[in-house]
């Protein structure tokens, strides 16, 4: 059942509006649908499906058109008839993004049974990455994709998506790279396109956009896997997170570790006191979740770190390569400057899951960064922060190992199983740090299949709320195993999963308790007032802020 549209629900702004809302009746039908009709294939272009405070330019592709579904049938036929023998699994160093248990031949039943495939290839059709299977065995399939794109481009157009029955094929051209998602999940084309953008950003973070363009300008059929060795597993983890824990990509925000505000403020002050030559950004994180961040005025000038870049860093430091000790590596932030590198110092603190990330512009500053690490570590010991974070991490049993979280029982709202909450009423000066919060996934969502099913429901609700053809403000959906309520206002974006036995009146009561609890705990759940960045140096009218300080190694 839905309550939506201009005539159904006035612009809500608080719990009182939800109580007064009259939910229209829904005809008996498939209870698993969010709406009686199927979703509009055109729902949610990237610029409209992002968060309310996210600039549209971050996800806007070039103007494109959609191809007919008959082309998809041609692709499937060609893939099924590919006579290439299954490729032998290669080591990580060879650039395989495959699961060793999955066959590499498109005619293999296990490969075809996957819900979603993601491919990366060059304009010349050279395979670069495949989520499942051997890229060698998929070379003919990728050749068909290249032919489709070239055929549409020859008519002066660009292909965006193909729809055929329960499949979506989404294409994204980024310079010399072509990214393709083939999906039969409930994700909209816009959500899949955002996922492809995240995959491209991960590739750029390793090589930079300028390097990729220069390589293929020199040699169109270059095998980029040589330079991406070791990055495939990172791409695999990124795509897995969308299935298991979609909040960050879906809401365009980062998740913070629940922490008492005085301790968080003290940690922010500690980071600002530790300086090194060329230090640009200091980040404390644990389990892929943000503790606090401090930005250096003199290096970043008027630039602000985009949440997509920050989430990329949080995912990056979660790689097994950084599980112990310290590391020094270049990393590109695609939103900040896709053509240059920072130099990143990554270290675990005191054998704990707490991670310190220091970004700088000086390639010779490793020892200075290591000295900063010792100061931060000593300061956290004095504050008792390592002990506090360690105790919180021991509570977690979720997919993100050692990620401090909280139980949904802390809300004190019987019938509430899970939720995603993103505040939108952030002070204007802090909108560069969109955040969201969600509790630990507990029973009945302890198993991977159940988490995937909940993720599908969240994606479906998000697509309806942010549809370009008929955006909704409020959705009340009764499914077979749970009841869901999604609500977006000028103050927040909320997705709640409730017991299937909850009535409409009960759902309203649960949401009321949840909103009151979030308001009470907001200083602990969010960085409501992030560590004050130093005031940027003033620039004259004829001197634009410099965003390209780092031009590579």
From Swiss-Prot:
This protein's encoding gene: Mon1b
Disulfide bonds: none
Phosphoserine: residues bearing it: 57
Residue ranges, annotated region (Disordered): 1-111, 534-553
Organism: Mus musculus (Mouse)
Stored Pfam families: Fuz_longin_1, Fuz_longin_2, Fuz_longin_3
Compositional bias annotation for Low complexity: 78-95
Name of this chain's protein: Vacuolar fusion protein MON1 homolog B
Cellular component GO terms held in the UniProt record: cytoplasm; Mon1-Ccz1 complex
Modified residues (N-acetylmethionine): 1
Biased composition (Acidic residues): 96-108
Residue stretches of biased makeup (Basic and acidic residues): 23-35
Annotated Polar residues bias: 52-72, 541-553
Subunit structure: Interacts with CCNT2; down-regulates CCNT2-mediated activation of viral promoters during herpes simplex virus 1/HHV-1 infection. Found in a complex with RMC1, CCZ1 MON1A and MON1B.
Keywords: Acetylation, Phosphoprotein
Gene Ontology biological process terms, A to Z: early viral transcription; late viral transcription; protein targeting to vacuole; vesicle-mediated transport
Family from the record: Belongs to the MON1/SAND family.
